[in-house]
Amino acid sequence: MVHSCEQAVAAGLPGVAFTDHLDFTTWTDGDRIGAMDLDPHRYPRMHLLDIGGYLATLDDCRQRFPELRILSGVEIGEAHLWAASAAATVAKAGPGGPDRILGSLHAIPHEGRLTAADDLFRQMPAADVMRRYFAELLRLVEGSDLFQILAHLDFPRRMWPRAAGPYEEQAFETEYRAVLNALAASDRMLEVNTKSPLLSAGLLGWWREAGGRAVSFGSDAHQPWRVGDKFKLAVDVVEAAGFRPGRDRFDFWRL
């Protein structure tokens, strides 16, 4: 986290949010997945989230880098399936909860298990993977109010197989619009994720047409050197779609 802050300062960013992943492999009362008879182990390796260590390191970074606004955060995976577990964990972050809460989808139910998106490309045609993904993403948006920002809208696009030909957003316009309509209706925000292939200005136009009023920028870094990566290009795309800087340099970009 210290190195990420160093990179943020070097990149000229006014602030950074550390949105660590929050994924679950067990469930409790109130978690929908408990009634679905699904194997939830969608990744070969998952590590415990050290909330105490995270918060202590966050405080240390704030002391070291007073010129940065350093926000707490979390990225909840499949929040619609683990509503109770996710809510209980978020509450441990202290009064008011994390500054930023992202919602994301990395895996979908398939043949009795929660299956990671990249595995699905080995089991069905690429277009079917995307349609299955968007259908589950819509269930996430409609089925969870825990998050503020929807992360990496078309996550499996990162793994789109070359053999399937170029990825065309227009081929999935109906699916994109369904998700964007639901997200806008809930008055939440869309992330422009610079680790994924950048959303086009046209797709961000669909977000505007759905009633979306704001976007956030996320480098989805995972490594310090990626903090702020491609933000200048992302700004160009977002501006082309009509969004502008918000009330101050820390705000979301808005219409």
Regions found by a protein language model. Name each.
Residues 1-80, 158-170, 178, 222-229, ...:
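An N-terminally biased module of ancient metal coordination in phosphate/nucleic-acid-related enzymes
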Residues 1-7, 81-91, 132-141:
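Short, acidic/polar
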Residues 16-18, 70-74, 101-103, 149-151, ...:
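Hydrophobic faces of well-ordered beta-strands that scaffold small-molecule active sites
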